[in-house]
């Protein structure tokens, strides 16, 4: 049967040697059945077959069968050398087998070289790899050889490349975000729009494939995730700086969590930025732990996105969830108009920030008990309330009281003298 399959391969392969890309799946599927035997027996036969079957099998059928033998014998390197020596009787087999050796020795380069346009090589590589994956056959590499190598390379590299680009972009963006939140919000949104537009242009071609590939390639995305995590873990230095910057802004953060859901609205559609941004969103709840903790109950119950509030210690899970959210929002971005998302985002981001800053100023004022001090200030009209409002949250309240009393005394003799 194997000899018949070899003869079938030899005839078909020689006859269709140019169209092997179309024909080889048939004989390769024929090979699938005896492939476990092919690897074992054909290695033995090839020595005999090469002398006997060469006129029939010609370069092609020997080359896949012996490529199979070669893969089978890659573990047994002395094997292919005599077969190769026997195969050198045909220059074509030598060429094919040399190519197949170069292709087949590294399996990874095989899958890549299977992409090589000469279908003879690619299909031989596929048939050999199919025989190597005897269960899968050519169907494993042939459709996927074109698809995953094509699409996975796109899925692997395109997400990889924009991720890397965005990582490079985000490091300054995050610095800007943390230095100036509002302007960085615009700046980040603008760049994110550009990035998302560029990414959309990329994603229009295989949107579903990429979603599937992201979900399937989370393991390979673990590399870009690893890149992001490495950058994000390298960012804790920046985060420490950022936390120092956010330290005085923490009252803003205590009020800002209502702004957070709007920001993740930015961040979720903004596809690759978010994991870092979300972490930066997440760490602010952490610094309040260092600083006044009562803000944490404010931040957590308030409508922050649940991932940053809970997995503060679970940033890795956060990153995974965020990547999933990214993937979901990537499709949402594909489906929804970006403007419909971004405009409310840009609109929502700033109104919360607008009131938040005065609220953040007002909250410490009320906490500092400015109202009685204001009452005392209202007595001496000479004291301008507006500059003192800035001073109010400071512990200057007691000296302000004493100053107000002094002012009252000074005014009272002035009034009496006048």
UniProtKB/Swiss-Prot annotation:
Modified residues (Phosphoserine): 171
Residues with PTM Asymmetric dimethylarginine: 342, 353, 391
Gene Ontology molecular function, alphabetical: chromatin binding; chromatin-protein adaptor activity; enzyme binding; histone methyltransferase binding; identical protein binding; nuclear estrogen receptor binding; nuclear glucocorticoid receptor binding; nuclear retinoic acid receptor binding
InterPro entries (UniProt xref): NCOA6
Region: NCOA6IP-binding region, residue numbers: 60-214
Residue segments, region NCOA1-binding region: 1-418
Keyword Transcription (UniProt): yes
Official protein name in the record: Nuclear receptor coactivator 6
Native organism: Rattus norvegicus (Rat)
Lineage, uppermost ranks: Eukaryota, Metazoa, Chordata, Craniata, Vertebrata
């Amino acid at each position: 049967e194997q000899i018949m399959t070899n003869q079938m391969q030899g005839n078909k392969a020689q006859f269709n040697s140019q169209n092997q890309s179309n024909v080889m799946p048939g004989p390769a599927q024929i090979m699938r059945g005896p492939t476990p035997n092919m690897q074992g027996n054909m290695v033995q036969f090839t020595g005999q077959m090469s002398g006997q079957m060469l006129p029939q099998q010609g370069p092609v059928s020997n080359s896949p069968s012996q490529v199979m033998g070669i893969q089978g014998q890659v573990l047994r390197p002395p094997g292919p050398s005599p077969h190769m020596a026997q195969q050198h009787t045909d220059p074509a087999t030598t060429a094919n087998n040399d190519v197949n050796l170069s292709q087949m020795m590294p399996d990874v380069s095989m899958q890549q070289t299977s992409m090589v346009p000469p279908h003879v090589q690619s299909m031989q590589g596929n048939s050999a790899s199919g025989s190597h994956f005897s269960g899968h056959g050519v169907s494993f590499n042939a459709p996927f050889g074109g698809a995953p190598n094509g699409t996975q390379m796109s899925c692997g590299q395109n997400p990889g490349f924009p991720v890397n680009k965005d990582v490079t972009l985000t490091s300054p963006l995050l610095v800007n975000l943390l230095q100036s939140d509002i302007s960085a919000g615009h700046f980040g949104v603008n760049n994110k729009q550009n990035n998302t537009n560029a990414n959309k242009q990329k994603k229009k071609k295989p949107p579903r494939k990429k979603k599937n590939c992201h979900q399937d390639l989370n393991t390979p995305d673990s590399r870009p995730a690893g890149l992001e995590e490495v950058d994000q873990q390298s960012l804790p230095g920046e985060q420490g700086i950022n936390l120092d910057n956010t330290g005085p802004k923490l009252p803003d953060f205590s009020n800002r969590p209502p702004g957070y859901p709007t920001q993740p609205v930015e961040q979720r559609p903004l596809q690759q930025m978010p994991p870092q941004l979300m972490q930066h969103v997440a760490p602010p709840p952490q610094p309040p732990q260092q600083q006044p903790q009562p803000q944490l109950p404010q931040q957590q119950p308030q409508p922050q996105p649940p991932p940053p509030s809970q997995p503060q210690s679970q940033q890795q899970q956060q990153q995974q969830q965020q990547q999933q959210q990214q993937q979901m929002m990537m499709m949402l971005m594909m489906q929804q108009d970006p403007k419909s998302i971004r405009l409310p985002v840009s609109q929502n981001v700033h109104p919360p920030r607008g009131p938040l800053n005065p609220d953040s100023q007002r909250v410490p004022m009320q906490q500092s008990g400015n109202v009685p001090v204001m009452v005392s200030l209202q007595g001496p009209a000479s004291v301008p309330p507006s500059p003192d409002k800035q001073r109010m949250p400071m512990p200057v309240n007691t000296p302000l009281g004493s100053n107000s009393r002094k002012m009252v005394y000074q005014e009272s003799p002035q009034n009496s003298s006048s």
